Structures are given as C-alpha cells and as structure tokens.
Amino acid sequence: MPKSSSNNPCPPGEILREGYYRHGYERRGFKRSSGTYIPPTEVSEAYVPPTCIIDRGKPGKGPRILPKPGNDLHLSWYGYAVHEPERDRHRALVEASQENDPLEVLRRLNLLRNYQAYPDVKDIMSQDVKFMSDFYAKYKERNQEANRFGRSNSRSRSNSRSKSSRSRSNNRSKSSRSSSTQSKSNNRSNSRSNSKTSRRLKKLPENDLDLDQDGGNRYGGDPLTSITSDTTGNQILETNIKLSKETECSEGKCQVFNKVYESHTINGKKIVFETLDQNDSENVLSLDKLYLDSDQTIDRVRQNLSTNKGYIIGIKSDNKLEGYCWYKEISNNEVKIFWFCANKGYGTALYTFMEKYFKLNNYSRIVIDVSMEGSYAVRRINFWNHQGFKTYQVKTDNHKIHMEKDI
C-alpha cells in the first residue's frame, strides 16, 4: 500500500475528494408494482463535505498522446514557415484564416507547436499561437455582435408580423390562422438558417491586424511537411552556402559552369542543395524511372548531365537524392525549367531554393511548359499553380500548358 502524503489527510490507499454543492432537483412521481402511487418530491440543494475515497488510479502521470495532424489543412499552402520573419508568418496565418475557419487554423498551429521538440522553434510557434488566439478572439467577438444584431432585427420583424397577423385573424377562419402560423414558422426557420450562413461567411479584415497588403513569401514549409514527412520541424540549425564557377576546357574551347552548394542540418538530417554531375547518374536514373513517363537509360542520363553541366541542381537528404531541377537561361532576365521532379515532402523545398538561386543570378521571370499527359499531370499542374505560376497559353499540339512567374 502506498504511504499517505503529508498534504493528504486520508489513510494509505485513499485520496481526498473535494467538497461540492449538489444542485436541487425534483424527483418524479411513480407507481409501484403494488399499485401505490408515490408523489413527486423535491430534493433541496445541499453541500457535500470532503470525504476520503479509494485511490483507483495508477501512480504518476499517464503517457502524453497527441492526435496526428491530418491532411485537410497545411499552413505551408499559405506560406507559413518558422524560419520566415514574424510579419510574413502572421500574414500567412491571416490568409489561411480567410479561407478556413480561424479556429481550425488555431488548432492546427497549436498541435504543430505541441509536436515541436526544439525549444527555440517552439518559442516562435508559441508566439504565433498567441497571435492566432488574439485573432480568433476578435473574429468571435465580431461574429457575436453581428449575430445579436441579426437576432434583434429578426425578433422585431417577427413581432410586427405577429401583431398584424393577430389583427387580421379576427376576420378569418381557422384554416387561415393555421396557414398564417405555418408561414411564420417558415420565416423564423429561414432567418435562423440565414443567420448561420452569415456566421460561416463572416471574416475579419486583414487591416484590423495592421498588416500590409503587399507580397509575402508563399513558399515556406509546414513544420511537419516542409522538408521531410517524418520530421517535426523546419529548423535550420546550421547553414553553409558556397557559390563558385568551374572552368572546363576541351579542344581549345573553354566553358564556365556555375556550381552551387548549400547545406542545412534539420532535425539531425543533412539537407544539401548542390549542382549535379555524372557521379549522380545512378540516383538521377532512379528518379527518372519513377517520374518520367518514358523509358530512360543510364547513357541518356549521363549525356544529359554532361550536355547541361551546371544547369541541374538537386536536393539530397543524408546523401540520398530526393529531387532535381534542370533549367536553362533563355534571355538575360528569363530562365526556363525543363524538368522538375521530387519525392514527397521535397518539392516545395527544392523550388524555394531554385527561386532564391534565380534571384541571386538576377533573373526576373521563370518559364515552364507543363505536360498534360501522364499519370502525374494533375499533380504537376496543381503544384505549379500553388507556387504562384500563371497559365498564359495551352498548347494543344503537344499537350502542354505554358506557365510563367515574375520574381
């Protein structure tokens, strides 16, 4: 038997239940099987004093079980990422609340915060949770005021209609009174349904939060899905960026190739963005066989890496290639993406890096022709729409969509 603690006056094996007030109530009357009727009785309110009861619980606290985040809402769709500035994070949360229930956004953010293991990032997300709590409080207060105003107007209209109905009912038959009652009930039900609809559609304007209306990075990651699907945060703990040029000479001709290397340590995993070469042929072939809707060989991969040297950048996780992007410069300020593929959880991260890299090279526009054929056609189109690309032309001859984005 466990020993009784100093602040527990009960004997070992028992705990003290706090005193409480029991509400009064009326016990219904009933008839016994013998035929005797027991009339109703009133049980008055009473105070139940503290008492010792058996401790049936196990010692210590139970395990903390958090619900799994679903796929109905991802904050990364609206540009939320913990490494973004506070203003951009708040703008993304407001945008998510404009298209979803603010309470759902708050719950999602709070759940991701509770999953967070790194104290620094958890502090950032805690600040955002407080921001969303204040946002939801304003939203709820404004909705309550609108509902009270709507109900008062509805009651005044209903009272005026009922008075006029009673004055007319003196000269009508019973059938007319019944039809009038049915009409009033329909009006009340319609007013209630309209009130519910207005509550669902009610949204809090952004300018109530003193946020500017321009721009905003929409390509940040959801803390659970940004880089890898099995990590619990998009925390950049270490950064190492190298930009260089490599000169290669052959048959008296020399060419200069760009080389890029950027590394991040995220949740113990080493995430690397770097220029690919022929040493990556096997890994590139594996991705091509998975995503390319045609046969691919190792010779073609090596030839493509050699021909387009310096224009193919990949993303690696612990030295495993998770995706790559092949691009070419088509003018002084335009760049075209010829091929882009990535495993689940790495596409947004790869594109975010590519856009940053293009900006560093003074490109102002990205062009891409998205194929409408193959098993991944819908996912491709949705992905580029989500990244902010606009459709300018549908090429029916080769079944491709021409999309562009200014950066």
From Swiss-Prot:
GO-annotated cellular components: virion component
Biased composition annotated in UniProt, kind: Basic residues: 158-175
Record organism: Acanthamoeba polyphaga mimivirus
PROSITE patterns associated with the record: GNAT (PS51186)
Keywords: Acyltransferase, Transferase, Virion
Locations listed in the record: Virion
Enzyme Commission number(s) of this protein: 2.3.1.-
Lineage of origin: Viruses, Varidnaviria, Bamfordvirae, Nucleocytoviricota, Megaviricetes
SUPFAM superfamilies membership: Acyl-CoA N-acyltransferases (Nat)
Protein's name according to its UniProt entry: Uncharacterized N-acetyltransferase R584
GO molecular function: acyltransferase activity, transferring groups other than amino-acyl groups
